[in-house]
């Protein structure tokens, strides 16, 4: 018996030390950060549609809390295994060595303990899933208000946003109350079982003593072991609850983080090679919410050709650009660049060969230099400064100063570039495109945020940028694209007219009507119902 006890003692010491090394050197250090990085990397591969259907704050919360929950799961599981091996197994061996009869109440208690856990733990896990989702929604609403703080202030809706966030906090607390009720009932049941265990084992030990089957010291030793086992039972109860609460959090997080990536490179996808820049839309059909937005669309853009796309709101102009960038899958047809189907090439290589300036420019919350070099991270400072001068941004960048005193190219632009004016953001975006120098250029209202004087100054630079490039320009201000090689007029996802500005005016069709309705150079849009 002594040899058995010594062996158990050394085995416990070895197991506890191994568990401690794993917990402190792996789980507490790099493990959660690696998980966050993997989850973040996974989300970055998701399609635009995935992000359009969720809160940015909610997704951030999922990344953070799921990684922590996985870490806590393994830490708690390790602690539970250590305690079970040290106390329960040791106590069972010792009691069995004294008398196998002492194991009877212990086994009955274990069965009742597992039955209680079987009842409460799945319910705690379900509540934890609801709680994790409620926490993510709460975080998403708070983050949404901060991200759009200018809109909140503009409409004087601070109180409304406060109540909106408070409603999600109430929903979160509802799950907390449910969790606490279940936890309390679980604890009460374990305390009752602990009393049953104490009475059962001590009563059995006393009976053995009265029968002359055990010494009086056995009662004292048994009492000490059972009291320790009772404290272990409470420890196990809380840790089992926490374990399955983390399981619920993990399950909830993986419902979001584990979603299938809709737009993926094919296994045999090759990098896109653009030598000329010819673009062909071949019988393209795209549906959104079961409605064809682009319907059997055919367009051949020659290498180096500059075309303008015109149409009322909802005609499908921006959708064409998103399809060209492979943000969505086509329902039918194909899009070819220099004869290569964009669905057969890698997404990164496709977008590396296309430069885009949109009307709603947002910048990263980083320095001016980092935002400009986002177009070509390996660019030199001289290359960057050259692009800045071409974009007519050199006049205001040296004047920029942030709250920490960083100035010029090192100044932080704020979240989405909120510290800059619309025109300044647009010029930095244009500088970024100059630096990227891609063979295909897309201008989606590229100068809409600029005043007439700056627009006139930058137009010559844009003309220089267009040289030897295939250009697609979308504009509501028709005067900015009237000189394009060809104008494409879209209507309900189809080409209604095409030709030069003069040819379309002579046709007296949709384009001519849009031209006539301009006021001061701006198009009065008519939305398609």
Could you say what each language-model-derived stretch is?
Residues 1-28, 32, 52, 104-109, ...:
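Transmembrane-helix motif of ABC transporter permease domains
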Residues 29, 37-67, 141-164, 239, ...:
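Short intracellular "coupling" helices and adjacent cytoplasmic loop segments at the cytosolic face
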Residues 94-111, 182-251, 256-257:
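Helix-loop-helix
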């Amino acid at each position: 018996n002594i040899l058995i006890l010594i062996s158990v003692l050394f085995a416990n010491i070895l197991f506890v030390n191994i568990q401690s090394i794993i917990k402190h050197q792996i789980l507490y250090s790099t493990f959660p950060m690696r998980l966050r990085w993997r989850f973040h990397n996974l989300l970055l591969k998701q399609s635009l549609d995935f992000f359009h259907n969720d809160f940015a704050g909610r997704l951030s919360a999922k990344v953070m809390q799921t990684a922590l929950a996985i870490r806590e799961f393994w830490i708690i599981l390790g602690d539970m295994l250590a305690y079970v091996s040290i106390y329960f197994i040791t106590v069972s061996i010792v009691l069995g060595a004294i008398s196998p009869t002492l194991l009877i109440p212990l086994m009955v208690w274990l069965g009742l303990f597992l039955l209680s856990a079987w009842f409460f733990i799945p319910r705690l896990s379900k509540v934890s899933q609801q709680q994790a989702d409620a926490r993510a929604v709460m975080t998403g609403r708070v983050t949404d208000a901060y991200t759009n703080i200018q809109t909140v202030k503009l409409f004087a809706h601070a109180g409304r946003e406060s109540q909106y966030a408070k409603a999600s906090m109430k929903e979160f607390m509802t799950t907390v109350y449910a969790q606490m009720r279940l936890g309390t009932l679980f604890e009460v049941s374990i305390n009752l079982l602990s009393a049953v265990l104490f009475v059962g084992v001590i009563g059995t030990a006393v009976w053995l003593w009265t029968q002359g089957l055990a010494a009086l010291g056995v009662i004292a030793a048994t009492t000490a072991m059972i009291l320790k086992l009772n404290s272990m039972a409470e420890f196990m109860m809380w840790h089992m609850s926490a374990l399955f609460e983390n399981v619920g959090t993990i399950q909830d997080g993986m419902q979001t983080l584990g979603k299938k990536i809709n737009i993926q490179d094919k296994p045999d996808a090759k990098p896109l090679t653009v030598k000329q820049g010819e673009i062909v839309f071949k019988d393209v059909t795209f549906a959104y919410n079961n409605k064809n937005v682009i319907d059997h669309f055919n367009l051949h853009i020659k290498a180096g050709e500059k075309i303008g796309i015109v149409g009322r709101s909802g005609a499908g102009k921006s959708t064409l650009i998103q399809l060209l960038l492979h943000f969505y899958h086509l329902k039918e047809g194909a899009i070819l660049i220099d004869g290569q189907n964009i669905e057969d090439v890698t997404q990164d290589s496709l977008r590396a060969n296309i430069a885009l300036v949109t009307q709603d420019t947002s910048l990263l919350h980083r320095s001016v230099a980092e935002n400009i070099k986002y177009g070509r991270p390996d660019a030199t400072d001289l290359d960057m400064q050259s692009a800045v001068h071409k974009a007519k941004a050199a006049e205001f960048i040296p004047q920029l100063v942030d709250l920490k005193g960083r100035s010029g190219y090192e100044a932080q632009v704020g979240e989405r570039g909120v510290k800059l004016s619309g025109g300044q953001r647009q010029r930095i975006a244009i500088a970024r495109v100059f630096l990227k120098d891609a063979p295909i250029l897309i201008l989606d209202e590229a100068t809409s945020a600029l005043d007439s004087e700056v627009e006139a100054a930058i137009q010559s630079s844009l003309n220089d940028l267009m040289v030897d490039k295939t250009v697609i320009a979308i504009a509501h201000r028709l005067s900015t694209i009237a000189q394009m090689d060809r104008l494409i007029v879209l209507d309900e996802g189809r080409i209604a007219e095409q030709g030069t500005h003069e040819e379309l005016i002579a046709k007296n069709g949709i384009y001519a009507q849009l031209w006539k309705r301009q006021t001061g150079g701006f198009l009065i849009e008519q939305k398609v119902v």
